[in-house]
């Protein structure tokens, strides 16, 4: 494949946009550098770049495009609303309709508020939890990404009794020291942290299924034990379902496992591809938020008609029979093919799959903790990434990210992808 136009445009982008990208995850720094491919359009499971190359897309905007690019039902709904106005600054009936659909799908959402991103949603749930409990400290799990607000850009201390340190320049140490980070899937470490910090802890923040050091499911009983330990301490459970809501199950990961939090943060997927966020939970807790309570949250774009319309249209597609069974079947076909090719070529690699999403790790370990993902072979992934890109397979440029399937991928797409993997593995010996 030729990337001449992408390379030209990247030089121009470098001149005007800091770092040439508007999110560092779009850079190819983690896969050895080079100009990121500039995309021009998308349709279904495919992307098309400025050089005219076609890709089977497994990035899917890091997960939210579960119905594929430019799904007709969603694009028509958005176009219809755009003709009526994009932003009013007033309440609309669409907000009520969308909130009702979300609450019908997810039983824990007694009350809902819309915001504009997953980062904003998580940030606000933390504020609400602190207001409700009148405590300050937060527990989170190593390797889980919760956006880029100060309180969640915190690296782990040396153990459950140790406070965190800033994971980004510009985050004050005083902020980081309100956060305790423990290993995911390690209930003993979590209990130790709760026992040590006790009534200083406002809430635990958890991705019920990890999406940011690859796809990692909770060990059996882990979420139930987190709930029990947390509630016995008088603290709240916050689920970050920015990636997981509606990705694996219509009612989110919490309804899939039948383990429900006190508060939930949403983003990405629920807007049908438009910028969106939301949070919700028990009425008693949510009533801490203005105008009913003392915890402040506001936003000019929050609940804007375009995002509401896109979200409603998305859920209308996902609530149809057979959607998640189809995604699971495609995911299994891809997983089985990858495992077969790993064996064929004697590649040191393993696969974690959760329904219609998976991660290929270049390691011989089954990944259940962040350290295992971090220690996987980044150089091998970088080589694999570029071999796949040159065959028209678009993956996230990071060893930590998932491959996301959509309702528009086909068995033929999976088979074409596996043919590309076969070649890539043959070049990696």
From Swiss-Prot:
Recorded metabolic or biological pathway in which this protein acts: Porphyrin-containing compound metabolism; protoporphyrin-IX biosynthesis; 5-aminolevulinate from L-glutamyl-tRNA(Glu): step 2/2
Modification type N6-(pyridoxal phosphate)lysine: residues: 268
GO molecular function per UniProt: glutamate-1-semialdehyde 2,1-aminomutase activity; pyridoxal phosphate binding; transaminase activity
Localisation per UniProt entry: Cytoplasm
SUPFAM superfamilies, alphabetized: PLP-dependent transferases
Main localization of the protein described in the UniProt heading: cytoplasm
Catalyzed chemical reaction(s): (S)-4-amino-5-oxopentanoate = 5-aminolevulinate
Keyword set, alphabetical order: Cytoplasm, Isomerase, Porphyrin biosynthesis, Pyridoxal phosphate
Cofactor(s) listed in the protein's UniProt record: pyridoxal 5'-phosphate
Taxonomy, superkingdom: Bacteria
Broad enzyme group: isomerase
Entries under CDD domains matching the protein: OAT_like (cd00610)
An annotated GO BP: protoporphyrinogen IX biosynthetic process
InterPro entries hit by this protein: 4pyrrol_synth_GluAld_NH2Trfase (IPR004639), Aminotrans_3 (IPR005814), Aminotrans_3_PPA_site (IPR049704), PyrdxlP-dep_Trfase (IPR015424), PyrdxlP-dep_Trfase_major (IPR015421), PyrdxlP-dep_Trfase_small (IPR015422)
A GO cellular component entry from the record: cytoplasm
UniProt xrefs under HAMAP family: HemL_aminotrans_3
Subunit-structure text: Homodimer.
Family indicated by similarity: Belongs to the class-III pyridoxal-phosphate-dependent aminotransferase family. HemL subfamily.
NCBIfam families in alphabetical order: hemL, PRK00062.1, PRK12389.1
Protein name per UniProt: Glutamate-1-semialdehyde 2,1-aminomutase 1
Gene source species: Staphylococcus saprophyticus subsp. saprophyticus (strain ATCC 15305 / DSM 20229 / NCIMB 8711 / NCTC 7292 / S-41)
């Amino acid at each position: 494949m030729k990337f001449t136009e992408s390379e030209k445009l990247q030089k121009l982008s470098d001149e005007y946009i800091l770092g040439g990208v508007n999110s560092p995850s779009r850079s190819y720094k983690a896969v050895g550098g080079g100009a990121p491919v500039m995309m021009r359009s998308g349709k279904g499971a495919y992307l098309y770049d400025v050089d005219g190359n076609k890709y089977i897309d497994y990035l899917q905007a890091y997960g939210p495009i579960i119905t594929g690019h430019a799904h007709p039902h969603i694009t028509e709904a958005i176009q219809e609303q755009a003709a009526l106005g994009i932003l009013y600054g007033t309440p609309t009936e669409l907000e009520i309709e969308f909130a009702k659909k979300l609450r019908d799908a997810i039983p824990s959402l007694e009350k809902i508020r819309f915001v504009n991103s997953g980062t904003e949603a998580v940030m606000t749930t933390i504020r609400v939890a602190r207001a409700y409990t009148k405590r300050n400290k937060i527990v989170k799990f190593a390797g889980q990404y919760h956006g880029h607000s100060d309180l969640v850009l915190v690296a782990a201390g040396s153990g459950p009794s140790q406070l965190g340190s800033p994971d980004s320049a510009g985050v004050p140490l005083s902020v980081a020291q309100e956060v305790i980070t423990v290993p995911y899937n390690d209930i003993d470490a979590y209990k130790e942290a709760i026992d040590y910090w006790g009534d200083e802890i406002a809430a635990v923040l958890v991705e019920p299924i990890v999406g940011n050091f690859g796809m990692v499911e909770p060990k059996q009983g882990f979420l139930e034990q987190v709930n029990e330990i947390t509630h016995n301490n008088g603290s709240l459970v916050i689920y970050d379902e920015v990636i997981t809501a509606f990705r694996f199950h219509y009612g989110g990961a919490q309804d899939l496992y039948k383990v429900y939090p006190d508060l939930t943060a949403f983003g990405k997927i629920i807007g049908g591809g438009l910028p969106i966020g939301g949070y919700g939970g028990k009425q008693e807790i949510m009533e801490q938020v203005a105008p009913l309570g003392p915890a402040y949250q506001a936003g000019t774009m929050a609940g804007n008609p375009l995002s509401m319309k896109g979200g409603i249209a998305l859920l209308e597609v996902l609530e149809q029979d057979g959607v998640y069974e189809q995604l699971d079947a495609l995911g299994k076909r891809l997983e089985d093919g990858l495992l077969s090719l790993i064996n064929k070529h004697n590649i040191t690699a393993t696969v974690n799959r959760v329904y219609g999403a998976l991660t290929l790790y270049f390691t011989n370990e089954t990944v259940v903790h962040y350290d295992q993902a971090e220690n996987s072979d980044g150089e091998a992934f970088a080589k694999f990434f570029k071999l796949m890109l040159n065959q028209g397979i678009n993956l996230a440029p990071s060893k930590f990210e998932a491959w996301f399937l959509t309702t528009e991928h086909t068995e033929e797409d999976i088979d074409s992808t596996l043919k590309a993997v076969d070649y890539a593995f043959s070049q990696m010996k």
